[in-house]
A protein has these predicted regions:
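Sec-dependent bacterial lipoprotein signal peptides
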Residues: 1-20
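Bacterial lipoprotein signal-peptidase II cleavage site
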Residues: 19, 23-35, 39
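N-terminal extracellular/periplasmic Venus flytrap/periplasmic-binding protein-like
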Residues: 62, 68, 72-166
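Solvent-exposed, acidic/polar segments of extracytosolic/periplasmic ligand-binding ectodomains
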Residues: 75-84, 88, 356, 457-522
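Beta-alpha junction/loop-to-helix N-cap segments that form part of ligand/metal-binding clefts
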Residues: 121-125, 136-213, 219, 281-291, ...
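Extracellular/periplasmic periplasmic-binding protein-like sensory domains
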Residues: 324-427, 514-518
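Segments of small-molecule ligand-sensing domains
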Residues: 401-424, 434-496
Length: 522
């Protein structure tokens, strides 16, 4: 019995051990599976955590590279050009410009009537006051513009050459400017002999422009253009009957004589015959030149002319007009605008009444309307007039249309006091110079100034129907011309209901449009 019990216990113990062994294998398998699962999950988690980290790391590495690429792609700022002494008359801080004006004492000494305000300094300040405005605003591209007053005696041509030497050699200016009066004969001293830019407010001959195309600029058309266009306009409007004989009162000054030559060619091509009398205006002897002009009246009459073209400046034409008044010849007269101030309000105020009804072909405007009344300023002209009265307190804030330059308190028959008209040429020239100097670059040269000038078009005061334009091959600013008639108006004339003084804007001689039509200069 006992043996059976022992055997039974042995069997039970064996089963227990087998069961324990089996349980241990299952646990190991489960533990291994769980461990593998946990390991896989951990690896996936690590991969999931590592992926963004790697992407962030890659992005962090790529971002500076991209920023560097972007920085490399952006254009670098232009280096600031330093101002240098880029040309004669230009330093790092200044530009020197010669303002060439007449020493009016010479005219006063011979008894030529000049208004009290019209002084030598006044003439130069019409330009230099604009320099003051530019300088107060910071200058031209940071440079101060310095005006150098240079004078000449209008009755002594040799002093004009001295003015050139003083400007170009003694002062070594960047450029020279003259609004009116300088004898064209001496312009090549600046432009050709000394390679200096010369800006002229009147008529520069084409032959001189061709000799120095990047140094000579003007407001008015060249003598050749004025003579040709003037003669063509006279012919086209039938002012001179076909087949007439035309006299040409010219000058031995080549710059003025070129207009006579051009007019002669047009007239002869149109079937007219011509005869020319040349006055010596280069001697500096005003009395002798006027005597020659006076003698020409009888000579033209003797040669049987029907019409005379007058090309002389008014300062040398007084003898001619005086003799016309004395002899009252039957032939008509036309003035060509090829000389200083011929067809300006100032010129009209100083021209002999014997020139009454003479025709002038000019690029200058006229305040008088051929329909009566007085024209108003356009916007640019109004600005010029305001600047003028601001510059010169002597005029007490008042400037009147058509009143001769420099007049102060000109009393009318009605007791009204009138003051000088503003100088339109100087205003236009200052406007153009400021643009060209600015556009010539931080370090301007005479060549860059010329290139800048030739690109300008815009307003023009009291000329060319209010507009102007230079061009690649056009060194004069005016683009249009018109025919005007000389009107004699005594200073005791009262202002009419239309605001004019017998057709003139002031009680003084003036120019009145013949038709009011402007003609483009080809």
């Amino acid at each position: 019995m006992m043996k059976k019990l022992v055997a039974l216990l042995a069997i039970l113990l064996s089963f227990a051990m087998i069961a324990t062994a089996c349980g241990s294998d299952d646990d190991d398998s489960s533990s291994s599976s769980s461990s593998e699962s946990s390991s896989s999950a951990a690896e996936e988690t690590e991969e999931a955590e590592e992926a963004p980290a790697e992407e962030e790391a890659e992005e962090a590495e790529e971002a500076p590279a991209e920023e560097e690429a972007e920085e490399e792609a952006e254009p670098e700022p232009e280096p600031v050009e330093e101002r240098t002494a880029s040309e004669i008359g230009v330093t790092a801080d200044t530009i020197s410009i010669a303002v060439i004006v007449a020493d009016l004492q010479g005219l006063i000494d011979i008894g030529y009537p000049l208004p009290a305000a019209l002084s030598t300094d006044h003439l130069s300040e019409r330009i230099t006051k604009y320099f003051d405005i530019w300088n107060a605003a910071g200058g031209i591209n940071g440079r101060t513009v310095e005006g150098v007053q240079i004078t000449w005696n209008p009755l002594d041509p040799s002093t004009m050459e001295n003015a050139c030497i003083e400007a170009t050699l003694d002062n070594e200016v960047f450029m020279a400017v003259n609004a009116s009066g300088f004898n064209q004969t001496f312009i090549p001293c600046f432009t050709e002999d000394n390679d200096t830019t010369f800006f002229y407010g009147e008529v520069a001959p084409q032959l001189m422009i061709d000799a120095a195309p990047d140094r000579l600029f003007s407001l008015n058309p060249p003598s050749e253009v004025a003579g040709e266009a003037g003669a063509e306009l006279i012919v086209a409007q039938g002012i001179i009957p076909e087949g007439s004989k035309v006299g040409i009162l010219s000058s031995n000054n080549p710059a003025i004589g070129a207009a006579g030559d051009a007019a002669t060619a047009v007239l002869e091509a149109a079937g007219y015959t011509t005869t020319t009398i040349e006055v010596n205006t280069l001697s500096g002897d005003n009395a002798a030149a006027n005597a020659e002009g006076g003698a020409a009246v009888s000579q033209f009459t003797a040669e049987g002319v029907d019409h005379v073209f007058v090309i002389l400046p008014f300062i040398y034409a007084a003898g001619f007009w005086g003799e016309v008044g004395a002899l009252s010849p039957s032939w008509e007269r036309t003035i060509l605008d090829s000389a200083s101030s011929n067809c300006t309000p100032f010129g009209a105020s100083r021209t002999d009444p014997a020139a009454n009804n003479a025709i002038c072909v000019t690029s200058y405007d006229s305040y008088a309307s051929n329909d009566g009344g007085v024209d108003e300023d356009d916007a640019f002209e109004a600005e010029c007039r305001q600047q003028f009265v601001d510059f010169f307190p002597i005029f007490e804030g008042q400037s009147n249309r058509g009143v001769a330059s420099g007049e102060v308190g000109l009393e009318t028959a009605d007791g009204e006091l009138l003051n000088s008209d503003y100088p339109p040429g100087e205003c236009t020239m200052a406007y153009l110079m400021e643009i060209a100097l600015t556009n010539a670059g931080v370090n301007p040269t005479r060549d860059s100034f010329a290139a800048a000038m030739k690109e300008i078009s815009g307003p023009q005061a009291f000329r060319s129907n209010g507009e102007g334009a230079f061009g690649p091959d056009k060194n004069y600013y005016s683009t249009q011309m018109q025919a005007v008639r000389f009107q004699v108006t005594p200073n005791d004339t009262s202002r009419g209901a239309d605001g004019s003084f017998d057709g003139c804007p002031a009680p003084t001689n003036c120019w009145i449009p013949v038709t009011g039509e402007w003609f483009a200069i080809d």
